[in-house]
Each structure stands twice: as structure tokens, then as C-alpha cells.
Curated annotation (Swiss-Prot):
This is tRNA uridine(34) hydroxylase. Residues 123-217 form the Rhodanese domain. It is an enzyme of class 1 (oxidoreductase). Its EC number is 1.14.-.-. InterPro entries: Rhodanese-like_dom, Rhodanese-like_dom_sf, TrhO, TRHO_N. The active site is at residue 177. Residues 310-329 are annotated as: Disordered. Belongs to the TrhO family. It comes from Francisella tularensis subsp. novicida (strain U112). The keyword Plastid does not apply. GO terms for molecular function: oxidoreductase activity, acting on paired donors, with incorporation or reduction of molecular oxygen. PROSITE patterns: RHODANESE_3.
Length: 329
């Protein structure tokens, strides 16, 4: 088992004091060297973090010490390296942005379906199966026969529902996403619009991959994740995709052979969308990243601060040496 534990978590629960929760939670993350981002809002908590086994256990224990979070939903996977660079706790209006007021999964949502029961549900010809994730996520993997809403972000999902779904026609709707949070909020939206039988995959794709054997799986491809791994395979190990650092789209080794691909600057997804000014900025960022890598540092996060301090010290030393040389002359 690899050293770094990657923990995706969320819970819809009313947190009236979410603003006051921020600093103690951030302090706990920093104290335990847990990196990643957690979002806090009145409607709950959401995020993905990473650290050692002990560090993640300490963070979970801290969260569960709050009675409101004692049953927080979380999924774990493992990676050879730390996939995040910083520790962050952000305050938000929503922990996942749907952009529709009065949609509250704490009050109403669909029915959870355990991973072991998911295949039976989506094999039912009466079930309308919808992937609530974004276009670029769906491109690299999804469930067999799932509908792709072709959304660029989650805020576009309500429009898809209004234009394509009818509670009188679509009697049985099942939805899924990476970790469960988007599909849970989606079920709240559909219930508010009058849909009756609405289901969502408990724990999301990640929990399904963890619990359902490959030979029985109806998952096809890899699962996009929002960290440096880019995607995970059915064993929840880093998959075959990399990421374009300009547009953040997943890319394959074959994609890197295309003429539009320049490491850190562009790929075939964004080549015609990136301005020359942006390309110049990305090129400088890539240069700094390479320099940092050569010196054994990351170009962002805590290690970047150390590198910046070292560079500052070297410049000061060079100036001091030049000054002394001038004085001697």
C-alpha cells in the first residue's frame, strides 16, 4: 500500500457557524500536514485532502468530534506522491455550485443506492441513467448506457434538466458522479421539479470502483479526479491520463504527440483558444517549474516558498559580494 492516503469527503448538513469553523479546521490540517482543499458553507462540507495514514485519521477524528459530522461520507484511495501543494479551507455559498436557490439536499433528495445494488438499477430498461459530471470527465470514462448531458460545469445541469427531462415521461431517474455530492444535489433538484423515483449512487463512482469487482463492473474507462493523478483506474490507482496545464483537460500519451501539444503551454483542446500572451505566461511558468524541479523543489506551495527564500538569499549574497569587491577596488 502506498504511503499517501487521498481522502474525498462531503456531507450535506446545516452548519450555521461554518465561518467560525474555518480557522480551527485549517489549523488542524496544517498541524497534521494534511494538504488539499475543504469547502465550508451553510449547507455542509466538501473537499479532497491527502496525507499520511495517521494524518488523515487525525483529521477525520477532529471532524467527527462535531456531532453534525460524525457520519461524514468519505472515500479513500492511495498514491505514491502528495497530489496537493497547499492546505486550504474556503468559505462558499454552496459546497458544490448548482446556482439554484432553495435547493437543499438536507430537506429533500433522492434515494441512495448502494454500489452492490447499482448494476441491477441501471440494467432496468425503465431507468434513465444520467452522468452529472462535466464533458471532459465523461470523455475518459462513464457507466454503460449513461446519458452525457454535455455540460461544461455543474451550473449548466439545471438547464439540461429543463430542456430534456419530463417527470411525466421519465418516471425513474438514476444519477451518479465522482464522489456522490453532485448527484445528491441533482436529485434534490429533480425532486423539487416533481420527479418521483429519483436515485443516486451512494459514495459515487469511487465507492463503486472500490466495492464492485472488475468482472462484475459496468464501469467503462477511467475516473477523472481533481488532483495531480488526473484519473484513476478500476483499482483506484493512477490511470493513463496526464493533464494539460494550460486548460486542465485530460490528455493521453498519443495526445502529447500531436503538433498542438507543447508541455505546460497548450494541447489540442486549447491550442486555438489560448492567446499569445497566455502562451508566453504559461511558458514562463513551465520554465520556473523546470528550474524548481532541477533543484528538488515544487514551483508552488510550501516548497516554492523555500525556493524563493533561497533565491532571495543568493541574490543578497551576490550583491554583498559585489559591494565588497567594489570597496576593495
Amino acid at each position: 500500500m502506498s504511503q499517501i492516503v487521498v481522502c474525498a469527503m462531503y456531507k450535506f448538513v446545516t452548519l450555521e457557524d461554518f465561518e467560525a469553523m474555518r480557522q480551527p479546521l485549517l489549523d488542524t490540517m496544517i498541524k497534521n500536514n494534511v494538504k488539499g482543499t475543504l469547502l465550508l458553507a451553510n449547507e455542509g462540507i466538501n473537499g479532497t485532502v491527502a496525507g499520511t495514514r495517521e494524518s488523515i485519521d487525525n483529521l477525520l477524528a477532529y471532524l467527527k468530534s462535531d456531532p453534525r459530522l460524525v457520519d461524514i461520507d468519505y472515500k479513500e484511495s492511495y498514491h505514491q506522491e502528495m497530489p496537493f501543494y497547499r492546505s486550504k479551507v474556503k468559505l462558499k455559498k454552496e459546497i458544490v455550485t448548482l446556482g439554484v436557490d432553495e435547493i437543499d439536499p438536507n430537506k429533500i433528495c433522492g434515494k441512495y443506492v448502494e454500489p452492490k445494488d447499482w448494476n441491477d438499477l441501471i440494467s432496468d430498461p425503465e431507468t434513465v441513467l444520467i452522468d452529472t459530471r462535466n464533458e471532459y470527465e465523461i470523455e475518459i470514462g462513464t457507466f454503460k448506457n449513461a446519458i452525457n448531458p454535455h455540460t461544461e460545469n455543474f451550473r449548466e445541469f439545471p438547464q439540461y434538466v429543463d430542456e430534456n427531462l419530463d417527470p411525466k415521461k421519465h418516471k425513474k431517474v438514476a444519477m451518479f458522479c465522482t464522489g456522490g455530492i453532485r448527484c445528491e444535489k441533482s436529485t434534490a433538484l429533480l425532486k423539487a421539479k416533481g420527479f418521483d423515483e429519483v436515485y443516486h449512487l451512494k459514495g459515487g463512482i469511487l465507492k463503486y470502483l472500490e466495492e464492485v469487482p472488475k468482472e462484475k463492473s459496468m464501469w467503462q474507462g477511467e475516473c477523472f479526479v481533481f488532483d495531480s493523478r488526473v484519473a484513476v483506474n478500476h483499482d483506484l490507482e493512477k490511470g493513463n491520463y496526464d493533464q494539460c496545464f494550460a486548460c486542465r483537460m485530460p490528455i493521453t500519451e498519443d495526445d502529447k504527440k500531436r503538433p498542438e501539444y507543447v508541455k505546460g503551454i497548450s494541447c489540442h483542446h486549447c491550442y486555438d483558444k489560448v492567446t499569445e500572451k497566455q502562451k508566453a505566461r504559461f511558458a514562463e511558468r513551465e520554465k520556473q517549474s523546470q528550474l524548481a524541479a532541477e533543484k528538488g523543489f515544487s514551483h508552488i506551495g510550501d516548497e516554492a516558498k523555500k525556493l524563493a527564500q533561497l533565491n532571495k538569499q543568493k541574490k543578497q549574497q551576490a550583491k554583498e559580494a559585489a559591494r565588497k569587491k567594489t570597496e576593495k577596488n
